[in-house]
Amino acid sequence: MPSLKLTRRKIDSIPFLKPTLGSKKNQEFYRDLALPGFGLKVTKISKLFIVEKRINGILHRSTVGKYPQITPEQAREIAQETLYKLAKGIDITA
């Protein structure tokens, strides 16, 4: 999983996934260098901000929002709040 500081310019430069014959890869993740646990999921048709944290060996991942509907800065703030809730043991799926 590549790591980079998620900015508008960098996100715009990341291409959507192209379907290739025989490939089962349908998504790619990019981690943010500024906020551990925050990242971008790229598919064939969308770029989604995600937050993820491993708790007791189980990976918890949630979608923060879709780019460009929300900016990287807005998504980073939401992700920071979500990571805080996860650290406190609050269920983010409720």
Describe the predicted segments one by one:
Residues 1-94:
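Basic/aromatic DNA-contact patch characteristic of tyrosine site-specific recombinases
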